[in-house]
């Protein structure tokens, strides 16, 4: 996964002018609910004010010592407690460590919309049909798509990966 957050353009600050780091006195928070220090279970959040976007919702395949366990999924507790702030789920590509827990997520948390590249969207739809989960709000994006919320704007950069239709996600916030 690649998350790119734009940096402050110091050239745009006039001489003698104080640099304003935080718009509206709100912090932008970027954190992982899975995927750090492990290969799998990728799930990241960007939060600004009352808006949260989620990036990926993957599974971790268990080690041999976890007998009887098929998948390890992220802890959705934070998302459940902040369900009203969720603007959408953004998928970078169709590997299971990035989409494998979507069916579990949708059964636990209200996700208003899933944004995914075409190939990943097809894989997600198949996964949901196989598990009898009805969900109709999957929006397909490409490198020309921009998604704008009140405080967050999301853009996409096509990347080369071992699966077609993979993207980096660019998140613009009032803080950069």
Task: Name these PLM-found stretches.
Residues 89-99, 159-163:
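Histidine-centered catalytic micro-motifs
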Residues 1-18:
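Short, Lys/Arg-enriched N-terminal segments with co-localized hydrophobic residues
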Residues 23-29, 149-154:
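Short Pro/Gly-enriched beta-strand edge/turn motifs at strand-loop
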Residues 24, 36-40, 160-165:
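A short catalytic or substrate-binding loop motif that flags glycine-/basic-rich loops and adjacent residues
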Residues 45-50, 54, 166-176:
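Metal-dependent phosphodiesterase/nuclease catalytic metal-binding core
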Residues 119-166, 172-174:
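Metallo-beta-lactamase
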Residues 30, 56, 93-94, 154, ...:
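Divalent metal-coordination and catalytic microenvironments
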Residues 36-41, 48-91, 103-112, 116-120, ...:
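Pre-active-site segment of Zn-dependent metallo-hydrolases
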């Amino acid at each position: 996964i690649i998350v790119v957050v734009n940096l402050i353009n110091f050239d745009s600050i006039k001489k003698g002018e104080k640099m304003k780091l935080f718009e509206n006195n709100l912090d932008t928070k970027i954190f992982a609910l899975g995927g750090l220090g492990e290969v799998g279970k990728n799930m990241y959040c960007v939060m600004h004010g009352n808006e949260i976007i989620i990036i990926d919702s993957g599974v971790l395949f268990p080690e041999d010592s976890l007998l009887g366990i098929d998948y390890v999924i992220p802890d959705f507790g934070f998302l459940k407690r902040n369900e009203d702030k969720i603007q959408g789920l953004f998928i970078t590509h169709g590997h299971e460590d990035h989409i494998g827990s979507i069916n579990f997520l949708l059964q636990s948390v209200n996700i208003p919309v899933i944004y995914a590249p075409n190939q990943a969207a097809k894989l997600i739809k198949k996964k949901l049909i196989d598990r009898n989960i009805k969900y109709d709000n999957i929006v397909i994006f490409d490198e020309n798509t921009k998604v704008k919320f009140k405080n967050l704007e999301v853009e996409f950069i096509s990347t080369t990966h071992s699966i077609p239709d993979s993207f980096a996600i660019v998140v613009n916030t009032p803080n950069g």
